[in-house]
Design a protein with these regions (language model features):
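A cytosolic small-molecule/anion-sensing beta-strand core signal
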Residues: 45-46, 62, 80
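A short, N-terminal "cap"/entry segment at the start of jelly-roll beta-barrel domains
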Residues: 1-22, 32, 99-121
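Catalytic core of non-heme Fe(II) oxygenases with the double-stranded beta-helix
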Residues: 28-35
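Ligand-binding loop in jelly-roll beta-barrel domains
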Residues: 50, 70-97
């Protein structure tokens, strides 16, 4: 039976996603460089943009999909009003729910190590 998923992303334990949505972005909008503790998929429905993932530039347009692996830095600059679908993959145990930033948030291995240290104290 289908399950209605409330906004707070309360997914059942068997789910292979931890978040998804539709973005409506305007020319000049930018998604700042960031990373996640899970994989992310962007599917472009309409519009154009320039993405950077792990330092590699990609031009995105309708029908394109950009896959970013957990821990990969990525960003987007919108060059034509854009509608896209984003989908977040499985969040590992102790994963963090947000855009994570270099110099502010620990990379995944260091994040796990900090949890282990706290647990041992």
């Amino acid at each position: 039976m289908p399950k209605k998923i409330p906004w707070q992303m309360d997914f059942p334990p068997w789910s292979e996603t931890n978040g998804f949505g539709i973005s409506h972005l305007k020319v000049g909008d930018e998604v700042e460089p960031h990373f996640h503790d899970c994989n992310e998929y962007w599917i472009i429905i309409s519009g154009q943009g320039e993405a950077i993932s792990e330092g590699q530039p990609y031009h995105l347009g309708p029908g394109d999909m950009l896959l970013t692996e957990a821990g990969q830095y990525h960003s987007l600059e919108v060059t034509e009003d854009m509608v896209s679908v984003y989908y977040y993959g499985v969040m590992p145990e102790h994963g963090r729910w947000s855009h994570l930033h270099e110099g502010v948030d620990l990379p995944w291995a260091e994040h796990l190590a900090s949890i282990a240290v706290k647990a041992a104290q």
